[in-house]
Amino acid sequence: MSNPKAIKIIKEFIKQRDWEQFHDPKNLAISLNLESSEVLELFQWTKDNEINNNKVTNLKDELADVYYWLLLLADHYDIDIEDALEEKRK
């Protein structure tokens, strides 16, 4: 399983808020895409040397959001991300 500790933390967070009802595969995929777009937005209209500490902090937050939704979607389909990466490399 992909990062079981993170998945456990995420699932507890979701359960406390009664959000399971909203987490069908379609909504998980949409949320993953939306968060990925927020990563892209940080780099829009900038040059490489314009990425400052504030943007790096924002990037960290957005990457965490992407990881959150990626783990949930993978977990829904019992996909181990590390195994999928290994298989993809072959």
Each model region followed by its residue ranges:
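Flexible "arm" and connector segments at domain edges
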Residues: 1-63, 67-90
